Amino acid sequence: MWPLLHVLWLALVCGSVHTTLSKSDAKKAASKTLLEKTQFSDKPVQDRGLVVTDIKAEDVVLEHRSYCSARARERNFAGEVLGYVTPWNSHGYDVAKVFGSKFTQISPVWLQLKRRGREMFEITGLHDVDQGWMRAVKKHAKGVRIVPRLLFEDWTYDDFRSVLDSEDEIEELSKTVVQVAKNQHFDGFVVEVWSQLLSQKHVGLIHMLTHLAEALHQARLLVILVIPPAVTPGTDQLGMFTHKEFEQLAPILDGFSLMTYDYSTSQQPGPNAPLSWIRACVQVLDPKSQWRSKILLGLNFYGMDYAASKDAREPVIGARYIQTLKDHRPRVVWDSQAAEHFFEYKKNRGGRHVVFYPTLKSLQVRLELARELGVGVSIWELGQGLDYFYDLL
């Protein structure tokens, strides 16, 4: 599917790619330190000639911290924008405070829903809840809603069967969820449960989600569902959540956080989210565009580093990406088919690598696609990106 990438990967394995710095070039590069701007800019990236396909490593390093502070609260994207924040990438907490007005929902990844016995449920992770941070975000962004992710964790098949077949269990589950939202001053939840359950129980899961949504809506709370891609990556086969399920839940739920990333694997390295695949995932879910505004197209603010010799990959977040650019000064290549940038580099003893990581241009193209399709976006996650990305939102 991606001929350019297949050729590149073969070249990496064979060790014949000539874009890597020679030893003499590497010594010259090491003698110079790439500069990073630390001051804000009075212009957004769109007006600074930075949203282009032909990018250079030194320009990314120089500009990535320099966002337009004067427009940090102005929105450029009219649709819904959900941003995830995780405790393990704490920079996301600062991003939410600075750029909160660009988001309609912020989802801290704090909570787990566990079944403790018959009609007994507990939400764990409350020790991570930061009320002061929530107040600070809302102070600077009046309209933003705080909707923590709620993960169904450690549920067995028997747990699901017992709950989905019992109205009393579903009622107790809903009561527990609503009560925690009220106690903690949340605006709702992003529920992650669909991928944890085998397909034969999806009818019962739709029934449970319907009851949960009714209970949350009665308390004036939001419910957004995390859903896997509608087209299985690397195939033309339908995924676990398709138009059939979407059509039943779209009138009931407030949104769908669509996981349109992690397309490639360590065995088949390539782009994180090819543009044609993203489009197909939306069109399969809602071919008639009836509920498109509720679909939140997943945007990854992380990348992947593929090691040719080990047949392995590792996630790349902003700090590591910038350091890799500093250390190796690679030639960054635009894949026009996938609409993503990538580069290759060689470690001293670790062999050759290919890195895919979002850029201003790849993100702009996806935001334009979201506008065209009439969908919102969901970002995983705010602590992993580069600060100047937010000029685009």
Swiss-Prot record:
Residues 1-19 form the signal peptide. One of its GO terms (biological process) is negative regulation of cytokine production involved in inflammatory response. Residues 79-393 form the GH18 domain. Keywords: Immunity, Innate immunity, Lysosome, Secreted, Signal. One of its GO terms (cellular component) is extracellular space. InterPro entries: Chitinase_II/V-like_cat, Chitinase_insertion_sf, Glyco_hydro18_cat, Glycoside_hydrolase_SF. Pfam families: Glyco_hydro_18. One of its GO terms (molecular function) is oligosaccharide binding. The keyword rRNA-binding does not apply. It is found in: Secreted; Lysosome. The keyword Secreted applies. CDD domains: GH18_SI-CLP. It comes from the Eukaryota. SUPFAM superfamilies: (Trans)glycosidases. Transmembrane segments: none annotated. Saccharide- and LPS-binding protein with possible roles in pathogen sensing and endotoxin neutralization. Ligand-binding specificity relates to the length of the oligosaccharides, with preference for chitotetraose (in vitro). PANTHER family: CHITINASE DOMAIN-CONTAINING PROTEIN 1 (PTHR46066:SF2), CHITINASE DOMAIN-CONTAINING PROTEIN 1 FAMILY MEMBER (PTHR46066). Interacts with STAB1. Belongs to the glycosyl hydrolase 18 family. This is Chitinase domain-containing protein 1. The lineage of its organism: Eukaryota, Metazoa, Chordata, Craniata, Vertebrata.
